[in-house]
A protein has these predicted regions:
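Conserved helicase RecA-like core
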Residues: 1-331
Length: 331
């Protein structure tokens, strides 16, 4: 909410914000207000919101649906992994706000379906995740296509050097805002480490899942291959689960997310990149089956529980080879 007054003045914003902190409202509401005030609106795109994954693009689009419900502001969303025809038709009709993932945006620009000459507001969301997913080159290719005179709103949960360099080139005297959840990660999450042999991790997971019957559980795996293996192991133990990772089709990921959110399945196995789209307020338990290589990723992972003031539990399985990773996180 702190970002809204600054964004309404048209200033550039640099927001250090995690997922689940209400930052969509921080950029969407001011943009909708600015566009609603325009007298002569043509079909051109006036606001571009760039986000790393289809899941996030859809979530942002749903929020804009709510905020723009009683306005004349039109918006649309584009992402890869689906036929482009419906998206092209939507663009022909004209949208004021376009929510997009980088690959599909550049693709449709190269085909001549998208022009960004009239963009007044540019939002770069989850910039650090864009970096993790290798989209930074796409973004650098995109920037020269945007008008020099525009408002830029830049959000990132962490600020590594590459991101800081990008903000320096992109933002003009930005208002800096740290949007933190009401309580810090540590306050609402009980964290426990189990030191366990690598080959015993499956047994430990099955035993914990039996004890937490009825609870939704998100399990993190470092690799896609291991995520699929965990699903097979749990299935043999009579526990239903689904995996989401980059090798799954967009539709498979979307349907697995829906099943998890609605409680059709209670156990979701995810890799870090795929999990960025999971936004569930009441998730009581997160399990790190494998430790992440980077301490920030651990914070992202356990931040999936203990949301919105609810308490949560994060369990971490640590094998002999992973001891150093635990001490890095503890620092």
């Amino acid at each position: 909410v702190k970002a809204i007054p600054a964004a309404l003045t048209g200033k550039d914003i640099l927001g250090c914000a995690q997922t689940g902190t209400g930052k969509t409202a921080a950029f969407a509401i001011p943009i909708i207000q600015h566009l609603q005030a325009l007298k002569n609106r043509d079909k051109s795109i006036k606001a571009l919101i760039l986000t790393p994954t289809r899941e996030l693009a859809l979530q942002i689009s749903e929020c804009i649906d709510d905020y723009a419900k009683y306005t004349q502001v039109r918006h649309g969303v584009i992402f890869g992994g689906v036929n482009q025809r419906a998206q092209v038709n939507m663009l022909h009709k004209g949208v004021d706000i376009l929510v997009a993932t980088p690959g599909r945006l550049l693709d449709l620009m190269n085909q001549g379906y998208i022009h960004l000459d009239n963009v007044r507001h540019f939002v770069l969301d989850e910039a650090d995740r864009m970096l993790d997913m290798g989209f930074i080159h796409d973004i650098k290719r995109l920037l020269p296509k945007l008008p020099k005179e525009k408002q830029t709103l830049f959000f990132s949960a962490t600020m590594p050097d590459t991101i800081i360099a990008l903000t320096n080139s992109l933002l003009k005297q930005p208002v800096k805002i740290a949007i933190t959840p009401k309580s810090s990660t540590v306050d609402t999450i009980e964290q426990t480490v189990y030191f366990v042999e690598k080959k015993e991790k499956s047994k430990l997971l099955i035993s914990i899942l039996h004890k937490t019957e009825g609870q939704s559980v998100l399990v993190f795996s470092r690799t896609k291959h291991n995520a699929d293996r965990i699903v097979r192991v749990l299935s043999k133990a009579g526990i239903g689960s689904q995996a989401i990772h980059g090798n799954k089709s967009q539709n498979a990921r979307q349907s697995a997310l829906e099943n998890f959110k609605t409680g059709k399945i209670r156990v979701m196995i995810a890799t870090d990149i795929a999990a960025r789209g999971i936004d569930i307020n009441e998730l009581p338990l997160v399990i790190n089956y494998d430790l992440p290589d980077v301490p920030e990723t651990y914070v992202h992972r356990i931040g999936r529980t203990g949301r919105a003031g609810n308490s949560g539990t994060a369990l971490t399985f640590c094998s002999q080879e992973e001891r150093k990773l635990v001490s890095d996180i503890q620092k």
